[in-house]
Amino acid sequence: MGPEKSTAMTETSAAVRIQAWWRGTLLRRTLLHAALSAWIIQCWWRKIMIMLQGKKRRMALELYARKTWAIVKLQSWFRMWHIRHRYCRLLNAVRIIQVYWRWHSCHTRGFIQGNYEIKENRLNIQLEISLGSQACKVEQCITLPIKE
């Protein structure tokens, strides 16, 4: 082994070291590029998922608002129907009483005169009954069973 062979070995080993360093640099560059690309894709995916979650949240809120509105509307319709039903029964009772009083006054030679007025949740009834020389005046205020 002479000096030529030893310098050839050192040149070869130096070339191998340079090539290994260069391959390592290329590999690190490729890995860095792949990692950055993966990071960009992950950021984009997280953004898409946040948008989808926001959309789902808005849709759930809108559905809740629609259901709540429907429940309130249904309750108000039921209350309206119930109050109207009671009001119609009360009016029917007033009409029946009026018919009987008129029939009675016609058959006893007296007369009944009166009126009724409905204000808000009150029924004001004013009746004047005359039978010959006797007279009776009735005024009554009845509160209707309307809940507010």
Curated annotation (Swiss-Prot):
Stored SMART domains: IQ
A Pfam family that the UniProt record links to this protein: IQ
Positions of the IQ domain: 11-40, 67-96
InterPro entries xrefs: IQ_motif_EF-hand-BS (IPR000048), IQCF (IPR039887)
Keywords from the named record: Repeat
Stored PANTHER family: IQ DOMAIN-CONTAINING PROTEIN F5, IQ MOTIF CONTAINING F
Protein name (database record): IQ domain-containing protein F5
Gene source species: Mus musculus
